[in-house]
């Protein structure tokens, strides 16, 4: 189903579009969380810590895939909004060709420098080998990660958020089943977790690719279209590169934070690993609504209806606030039960560390959703410089405050840095949003 954001009230279209996207991300995150849960429950605290220690590094690789997703989504949204179906197909094939080349480079780099990266963040020695093993297997799946994210970006640009959900339902179930077989039955430990993810991503990517190209056959008619278009390549990367830089900056910040966490031993690392997965689950739910706003904004700009964008922004704020409240209640009121999903009762120190993180960070979700909705509008409008610039203070403040607070409050002080970074980033993003509105005129 293709959604046109340029006609109906956003209260209707954004809600209908967001729900399948939200479930897609939920299932994607569920099998990420399942990796950690099964590792912690069946392979032990050190296995959970090893997967968790490598997680900030995998997020850097993910940043490239998400950047290509965004680049393809915004460019295709504009072409689709303008009614240029031939352009849509050329932009899609260009995005795939570019992403395959990028995936090859990242795979080679990740494999040969995995041990160096784990050493740079001072990974505890008792989990170092497992962390490196997990990372090496993970990078073999870069081609699938890239392909799936570009497919998802194109489906989103065309207003179809249901198709990616169907693929994720199957691959999520498959990933969990494979986790249980490889880790609980075969006792492959961390390697079993990594291979389960690799296989699940591969199935999802191939199915998404086949479905997308079968759907695009009608877009260009019988006339043969060029597979690669230099102009669309430049447009895609003009959006993708700032997004990659923005997310990489965040990921580097997370690496610095992980470095600080690692100094407190594998128990704190394990607790942080579980808590950060829960935090990421919530944040990604909110981010999907921001992605909806990007498509909404890009389509309306392409159709010459930019005056509809502030209306969509207000709808996004309302929906995101409603989504944030249950997570705040769950993570603050039931933090022990949440950490119990990952760790057995004997891992008391790890559970306590994770509970502290959730109780300190989760109440601020009601603020970060404002930034994420504003980010969605700014990305869709193509103002990527502002989008990137609002991220830097979050990074700097989070690292500085983590260093300062940890000296007096130990690992608890690290978690206290999150709200300060979010406050600065939210204020800056709102300032940039107002500038975008003034510069464009129609966004007033």
Model-inferred region functions:
Residues 16-35, 137, 148, 171, ...:
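Transmembrane helical elements of multi-pass membrane transporters/channels
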Residues 60-63, 107, 175-180, 204-209, ...:
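Hydrophobic transmembrane alpha-helices of multi-pass small-molecule transporters
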Residues 48-108, 145-164, 271-335, 368-382, ...:
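Small-residue-rich hydrophobic transmembrane alpha-helices
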Residues 5-42, 56-71, 75, 100-107, ...:
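N-terminal transmembrane alpha-helices
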Residues 43-56, 131, 135, 194, ...:
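Small-residue hotspots at the loop-to-helix junctions and early N-terminal turns
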Residues 30-48, 118-125, 181-188, 248-277, ...:
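Helix-terminus/linker motif at the lipid-water interface of multi-pass membrane proteins
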Residues 69, 138-156, 164-172, 193-208, ...:
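Short runs within selected transmembrane alpha-helices of multi-pass transporters and secretion channels
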Residues 1-18, 76-141, 185-241, 297-363, ...:
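Short alpha-helical transmembrane segments in multi-pass integral membrane proteins
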């Amino acid at each position: 189903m293709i959604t046109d954001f340029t006609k109906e009230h956003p209260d209707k279209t954004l809600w209908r579009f967001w729900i399948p996207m939200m479930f897609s991300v939920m299932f994607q995150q569920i099998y990420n969380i399942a990796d950690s849960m099964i590792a912690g429950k069946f392979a032990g605290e050190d296995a959970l810590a090893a997967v968790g220690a490598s997680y900030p590094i995998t997020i850097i690789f993910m940043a490239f895939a998400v950047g290509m997703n965004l680049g393809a989504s915004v460019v295709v949204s504009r072409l689709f909004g303008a009614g240029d179906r031939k352009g849509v197909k050329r932009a899609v094939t260009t995005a795939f060709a570019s992403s395959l080349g990028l995936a090859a480079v990242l795979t080679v780099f990740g494999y040969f420098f995995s041990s160096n990266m784990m050493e740079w963040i001072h990974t505890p020695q008792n989990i170092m080998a497992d962390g490196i093993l997990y990372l090496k297997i993970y990078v073999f799946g870069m081609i699938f990660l890239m392909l799936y994210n570009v497919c998802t970006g194109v489906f989103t640009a065309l207003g179809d958020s249901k198709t990616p959900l169907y693929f994720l339902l199957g691959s999520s179930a498959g990933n969990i089943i494979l986790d249980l077989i490889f880790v609980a039955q075969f006792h492959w430990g961390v390697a079993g977790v990594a291979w389960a993810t690799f296989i699940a991503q591969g199935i999802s990517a191939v199915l998404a690719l086949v479905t997308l190209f079968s759907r695009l056959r009608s877009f260009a008619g019988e006339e043969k279209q060029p597979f690669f278009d230099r102009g669309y390549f430049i447009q895609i990367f003009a959006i993708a590169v700032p997004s990659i830089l923005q997310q990489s900056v965040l990921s580097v910040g997370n690496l610095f934070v992980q470095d600080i966490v690692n100094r407190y031993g594998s128990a704190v690392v394990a607790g942080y690993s579980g808590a950060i997965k829960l935090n990421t689950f919530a944040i990604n739910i909110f981010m999907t609504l921001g992605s909806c706003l990007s498509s909404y904004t890009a389509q309306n700009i392409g159709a010459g209806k930019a005056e509809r964008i502030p209306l969509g922004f207000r709808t996004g704020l309302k929906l995101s606030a409603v989504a944030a409240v249950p997570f705040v209640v769950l993570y603050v009121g039931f933090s022990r039960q949440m950490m119990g999903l990952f760790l057995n009762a004997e891992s008391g120190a790890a559970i306590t560390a994770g509970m502290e993180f959730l109780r300190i960070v989760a109440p601020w979700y009601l603020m970060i959703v404002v930034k994420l909705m504003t980010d969605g509008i700014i990305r869709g409008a193509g103002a990527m410089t502002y989008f990137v610039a609002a991220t830097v203070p979050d990074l700097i403040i989070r690292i500085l405050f983590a260093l300062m607070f940890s000296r007096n409050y130990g690992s608890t002080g690290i978690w206290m840095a999150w709200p300060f970074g979010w406050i600065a980033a939210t204020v800056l993003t709102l300032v940039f949003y107002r500038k975008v509105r003034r510069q464009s005129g129609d966004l007033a």
